[in-house]
Amino acid sequence: MRRIKVKISYATAVIMGIKKGKLNFEMPTAYLMIGEKCIYNCSFCAQAREAQSDKNHLSRITWPEISYDEFIKSFNPEKFKRICLQVVSSKDYDKELDKILEFLKDKDILISVSIRPKNEQEVERLFEKYNIDNMGISIDVPEKSLFEKIRGTKYNKYMEILINSSKKFLHKITTHVIVGLGETDLDIVKFILGMKKNYISVSLFAFTPIEGTKYENLEKPSLERYRKIQYAKDIIDNNEVKIEEFKFDNKGNLKELPSYHVNKEEAIKTSGCTWCTRPYYNDSPNKTFYNIPKVRTFKEG
């Protein structure tokens, strides 16, 4: 096993005192990345096996690398509400993840792990051994044929792990959808509705083209389209609604939302675990944000 290195988001590094800088957004979650150069080959990912991207990037975020020893020396859980571990499926990632979680498990901080689990047993082991609060099992691509093309694995098997994990760990499993990978609005709305039935929370991302990836020349989704998906998600999250109440054209584009109240200020905030803001993950500082980096309203306890 290689000597353990930990990558931390630049904003996390500023709060930890490792980097200098000023933050103009809420940042109650520490973001870490474990592993490097994935064994998988997702077309959009900077860490994909064949990607020629900067190894210190995930999406558009820079992740400064520090040693494990420097991390445990510098990390103060009192500065954060939650810590989120982004796990790259590289060789020996499980040993590196175990070491980090062993250090964190007795700290007074919520722990999230975002991972591509090998099987349900891996999910169960991480929850039971390390008392993690949440696990993100990212589908990314909600349409079956596109998923298998872009992510290179069987959709049904992955969905089985996702749904069965939620049955074992109710309200503790999240998944991600990346808007703009060729799917339709209908695909996304159907998926979010299906996840709600399985008590799985969906986090939305806007596709971000990264230099050196297979999809480096694919365009980002329009902000108008992304807002419609955010509003649709808000309606689904807060109401008992059916797919028939959404109006789509014959190409699967969302044309009309159901007649429910939408809290637009809340709907466009970053979606994810409690305390998650993911600043600039798929947003440029000088452009209108897809996801506003503010903490969503929730009930503590």
Question: Where are the predicted features?
Answer:
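A short acidic, helix-capping loop that chelates divalent metal ions and anchors anionic groups
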Residues: 144-149, 211-215
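Conserved Radical SAM active-site core
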Residues: 14-23, 32-146, 155-170
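Alpha-helix N-cap and loop-to-helix initiation/capping positions
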Residues: 63, 150-157, 183, 187, ...
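Catalytic cores of alpha/beta
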Residues: 119-129, 181-198
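Auxiliary Fe-S-binding modules of radical SAM enzymes
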Residues: 1-28, 77, 190-301
